[in-house]
């Protein structure tokens, strides 16, 4: 089962990102949903299915359509936490009818799926310390101390975060959100800030505000940039 989900990982990541874009949801919803589904729901699902009480038709079989349903549930839960006006279950169901093409789910299925999702997570849905929120905080601090921070492209940061979720090995970086946020900030600095303006000592500054060793950050930056450049190559 884990292998099957792994095989679908890239498509599910793209499905989640496209769904949040079509729904015009803010980035915090997207990254909270990515964290809920890929960092928590998926890893805990195997253990959950090993329990007899875990039997549920939405999990048996666990095909792509059912997984897409749970992806929408992760977005729904994230939206409830971060949006002033959350999605209604009827709005979500209507959206699901458009984007899940292989199966039609009823409103009751969405409500059942939400409960199953929460049970798999043991109702632990906090997202305050995900890499995205740490990155936002770092960028705010960076702009306060360095004028060049205004030139750092936050869209590039988000593009890198999206790419890192596509593969199992790179997504493991999200287990250390502080290190990842610092490394993505430095990576975006290298890519988007004009070289002639590299006057700010960004590595010593990152070390000061995150307590992360420069060597650790440099190694992660090299790994991230290699992955990003490889992913964008023909």
UniProtKB/Swiss-Prot annotation:
GO biological process, one term: regulation of cell cycle
S-adenosyl-L-methionine among keywords: no
Gene that encodes it: CYCJ18
Annotated family: Belongs to the cyclin family.
Lineage: Eukaryota, Viridiplantae, Streptophyta, Embryophyta, Tracheophyta
InterPro entries, per database record: Cyclin-like_sf, Cyclin_N
Provenance organism: Arabidopsis thaliana (Mouse-ear cress)
Top-rank taxon: Eukaryota
Protein's recorded name: Cyclin-J18
UniProt keyword list: Cell cycle, Cell division, Cyclin
UniProt xrefs under SUPFAM superfamilies: Cyclin-like
